[in-house]
Amino acid sequence: MASPQLCRALVSAQWVAEALRAPRAGQPLQLLDASWYLPKLGRDARREFEERHIPGAAFFDIDQCSDRTSPYDHMLPGAEHFAEYAGRLGVGAATHVVIYDASDQGLYSAPRVWWMFRAFGHHAVSLLDGGLRHWLRQNLPLSSGKSQPAPAEFRAQLDPAFIKTYEDIKENLESRRFQVVDSRATGRFRGTEPEPRDGIEPGHIPGTVNIPFTDFLSQEGLEKSPEEIRHLFQEKKVDLSKPLVATCGSGVTACHVALGAYLCGKPDVPIYDGSWVEWYMRARPEDVISEGRGKTH
């Protein structure tokens, strides 16, 4: 059983810096840069990683470690694929994984990989609070170049409780067995601002609640306190004592909702992996709620 320290969802930049300076026997640490950006931003996450990263970090490619047979972006891979990929990045059964990204927000895509490790049964995983942005602000050391972690043996077993499918969400329109929170920007949720992907109109799934993922972060890019997050959920009438599912555009920022709930003592929030892209492509026009064009065919 992992120590409570290893199960903490967030670790500070100073904690990571100290752990790198003085590694603990029997508790190997592996940092992963899980930076990912929407194509329209024109940022090359891997190239940026090679230019600068936290010492000892390896690059985790969300698109590469995915189900490449799916028509939808970066859907969860099979257990064997994930195990092989994580092992190549130096993650073994006893490894404490600390994930960050280099986004301007502080954390953007890293919570997706935090959720992936947990979904595949590895709970010794944390996020670097504030990401690379906060690390830089603390003037902590950096490295450059490609990383070459020593491969490790990693075993993965998917817990299906971490995922919801299109069919689950569709059935929930009638049954209302669980609440659904959408973490996209308000304009995209309402249908008044464009989606970043061609061929996908903005809008939302009927009955969903909108909490943009940036609402979970402070101006400095650090995660808000559990008290502030609890208030955020309460403001939107989300009951953390009842089942809750998170969605977004393609299953990345939804993981901020799962993280926020986890910090409030609710570790069981699954992600609708296909999220809005899948819903828009598969749902009936009347199940696409929008103040804009909606779905016309």
Swiss-Prot record:
The record makes one more remark, namely: Thioredoxin (Trx) or dihydrolipoic acid (DHLA) are required to release hydrogen sulfide from the persulfide intermediate.
Spell out the residue ranges making up region: Hinge: 145-160
Q: How does it assemble?
A: Monomer (active form). Homodimer; disulfide-linked (inactive form).
> Which keywords label this protein?
Acetylation, Cytoplasm, Disulfide bond, Mitochondrion, Phosphoprotein, Redox-active center, Repeat, Synapse, Synaptosome, Transferase
Gene Ontology CC: extracellular exosome; mitochondrial matrix; mitochondrion; neuron projection; synapse
Q: Which PROSITE patterns match?
A: RHODANESE_1 (PS00380), RHODANESE_2 (PS00683), RHODANESE_3 (PS50206)
A single GO molecular-function term is: 3-mercaptopyruvate sulfurtransferase activity
At what positions is Phosphoserine found? S3, S35
Quick one: a GO biological-process term for this protein?
Answer: sulfur amino acid catabolic process
Could you tell me what reaction this enzyme catalyses?
A: 2-oxo-3-sulfanylpropanoate + [thioredoxin]-dithiol = [thioredoxin]-disulfide + hydrogen sulfide + pyruvate + H(+)
The principal localisation class reads cytoplasm
Which residues carry the post-translational modification N6-succinyllysine, per the record?
A: K40, K146, K164
Can you quote the domain comment? Contains two rhodanese domains with different primary structures but with near identical secondary structure conformations suggesting a common evolutionary origin. Only the C-terminal rhodanese domain contains the catalytic cysteine residue.
Places the protein is found: Cytoplasm; Mitochondrion; Synapse, Synaptosome
As recorded in UniProt, its EC number(s) are: 2.8.1.2
Describe its function: Transfer of a sulfur ion to cyanide or to other thiol compounds. Also has weak rhodanese activity. Detoxifies cyanide and is required for thiosulfate biosynthesis. Acts as an antioxidant. In combination with cysteine aminotransferase (CAT), contributes to the catabolism of cysteine and is an important producer of hydrogen sulfide in the brain, retina and vascular endothelial cells. Hydrogen sulfide H(2)S is an important synaptic modulator, signaling molecule, smooth muscle contractor and neuroprotectant. Its production by the 3MST/CAT pathway is regulated by calcium ions.
Disease field reads: Aberrant MPST activity is found in a few cases of mercaptolactate-cysteine disulfiduria (MCDU) characterized by the appearance of large quantaties of the sulfur-containing amino acid, beta-mercaptolactate-cysteine disulfide, in the urine. Some cases have associated intellectual disability.
Residue(s) carrying N6-acetyllysine: K40
- Organism equals Homo sapiens
What is the regulation of this protein's activity? By oxidative stress, and thioredoxin. Under oxidative stress conditions, the catalytic cysteine site is converted to a sulfenate which inhibits the MPST enzyme activity. Reduced thioredoxin cleaves an intersubunit disulfide bond to turn on the redox switch and reactivate the enzyme.
Q: What is this protein called?
A: 3-mercaptopyruvate sulfurtransferase
Please list the residue ranges annotated as the Rhodanese domain: 25-144, 174-288
